[in-house]
Amino acid sequence: VAHVELSLSEVRVPAVGTPAEQEYDNLTSWSVAVSRAAEPCVLIAADTRVVAVSAAGSQLLFLGGCRDMIGQPLLDGSLRLLDFTANRGELTEPELDKIPPLLAITSGRLARGLLRIKGVSARAPDATVDAISTPVHRAGAVVGSLTFFSEV
């Protein structure tokens, strides 16, 4: 049985005389929501730098402290992605371009896929997560992506 939860939030109304673009920035708004989220999620800018990550997302992706990742490229070495072969090799550059957070930015569409994340130590198990990403827009242009994760 499917379960859907919805919530309502207040609509931001720009102050009189203030251009809507300045007051309402999607990345900034989403960064507040992501940093406070109980769900594992990450928000990245179009240049792939991490804008916000939830505590659960940081733990699930073996990223260390949430604040340490802010401003760092998502794939700077902290996030070690593996292929699904028996050899568990690290993903190559063309494969990395197809992971959901980056694919949502380049395609401007929803992206979904499984990711295998290398454990933090040799004995730690790898994590397999389902990633669902959506592009974040501003003035019709993609400025980042928001990704939610679920451990498989």
What are these regions (language model features)?
Residues 2-10, 91-129, 143:
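Per-ARNT-Sim (PAS) sensory domains and their PAS-associated C-terminal
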Residues 45, 121, 137-138:
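Short, acidic, Ser/Thr-enriched surface-loop or helix-capping motifs
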Residues 4-19, 28-32, 37-107, 135, 140-152:
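PAS-family sensory domains
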Residues 131-133:
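Sensory input modules used in signal transduction
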